[in-house]
Amino acid sequence: MHERNYAVFRLLPLASLLLAACSVHTPSGPAKSQTSPEWRAHQQSLSALGRYQTRGAFAYLSSQQKVYALFNWQQTSADRYRLILTNPLGSTEMDLNVQPGVAQLVNNQGKRYVSDDPEVMIQKLAGMSIPLNDLRQWMLGLPGDATDFTLDSRGYLHTLNYSHNGQLWTVTYQGYHDDTVPALPSNLKLRQGDNRIKLKMDSWSL
């Protein structure tokens, strides 16, 4: 798997407009503590979600490249998920299936790659550092293994810091869907050094 920056990410920049246009909601009032009943109840509700699907826009920005795509994340169990990246015209650019012990990626030319570590595979093939193993929790609004995190006034996750494989990731939550039960993130930003990842979740299916 020595190929790098292959055609899978030759995407149109239209999706960046979707990310730029997203609204950011910052609740007012004092932040809740990690021991607050609001956070504990919310955390318990999120942890009970075993199957879900979310669709939206994805951006990866670094000094080497800028990648924009639409995404569909399908979580079928705690350790099984599928991530589909499409261009704004609807054509599939990448289809990643992850199961315990094996990850399979198919690019837009139908070429298939298999690895036991999806993060390493994405890094080698596309030159993108994405903390996939933690992202499942972070997308839901859970801190995962992170212990350094803050909450907003409603008891929802607001920021977190987590060291992953020697890299310090900072995650900022910029909005939540109030029409879902429990409330789920609508916008979040990840930063690690010069690398930035932006996710805009347009819809959730539980």
Curated annotation (Swiss-Prot):
The keyword Signal applies. A lipid is attached at C22 (N-palmitoyl cysteine). Its main location: membrane. GO terms for cellular component: cell outer membrane. Keywords: Cell outer membrane, Chaperone, Lipoprotein, Membrane, Palmitate, Protein transport, Signal, Transport. GO terms for biological process: lipoprotein localization to outer membrane; protein transport. The keyword Lipoprotein applies. Transmembrane segments: none annotated. A lipid is attached at C22 (S-diacylglycerol cysteine). InterPro entries: LolA/LolB/LppX, OM_lipoprot_LolB. It is a lipid-anchor. It is found in: Cell outer membrane. Residues 1-21 form the signal peptide. It holds the Pfam family LolB. Monomer. Plays a critical role in the incorporation of lipoproteins in the outer membrane after they are released by the LolA protein. Belongs to the LolB family. This is Outer-membrane lipoprotein LolB. The gene is lolB.
